[in-house]
């Protein structure tokens, strides 16, 4: 179910609609969906360790759909950093990113080599546009004159959440080839 539907379902009080009647109504209307979800492989779906949806309900992440998801606002008192094992599982879905452990804080890290200093700033602008639309902001570093480095983690909890992987997946989809240095071909 989508994250938008869950808060509405949980906000219905028992006196308004009995749970059995609600389930039967949903089941009758969406038999195909219920049948399909009951047949899904556990290998293709992982429970998010963030548990950080607006409703407080757990979110489920099909590992292939990170870039289509939207970052959700953090409620620091209910949100916990994911374990290193959970982070390793999701890391497979964000090609090119590495896990870094900085003073017991897990972070996502990636580097690019750009053509020039100004191309690095252009790169940052493209990342900033995504970060603003997601409401989740990475640390951006321009090291030397052409090394772009990005670190992502959820600052409010001092660790990684699903939001960090969503942002990394969206950064991976950026069209930045025009900004990157071409690798020299061995002769």
UniProtKB/Swiss-Prot annotation:
Its EC number is 4.2.1.96. Keywords: Lyase, Mitochondrion, Tetrahydrobiopterin biosynthesis, Transit peptide. It is an enzyme of class 4 (lyase). It holds the Pfam family Pterin_4a. Its main location: mitochondrion. GO terms for molecular function: 4-alpha-hydroxytetrahydrobiopterin dehydratase activity. Residues 1-33 form a transit peptide. It catalyses: (4aS,6R)-4a-hydroxy-L-erythro-5,6,7,8-tetrahydrobiopterin = (6R)-L-erythro-6,7-dihydrobiopterin + H2O. GO terms for cellular component: mitochondrion. It is found in: Mitochondrion. The keyword Lyase applies. GO terms for biological process: tetrahydrobiopterin biosynthetic process. Coiled coil: none annotated. PANTHER family: PTERIN-4-ALPHA-CARBINOLAMINE DEHYDRATASE. Involved in tetrahydrobiopterin biosynthesis. Possesses pterin-4-alpha-carbinolamine dehydratase activity when expressed in a bacterial heterolgous system. Belongs to the pterin-4-alpha-carbinolamine dehydratase family. This is Pterin-4-alpha-carbinolamine dehydratase 2, mitochondrial. It comes from Arabidopsis thaliana. The gene is PDL2.
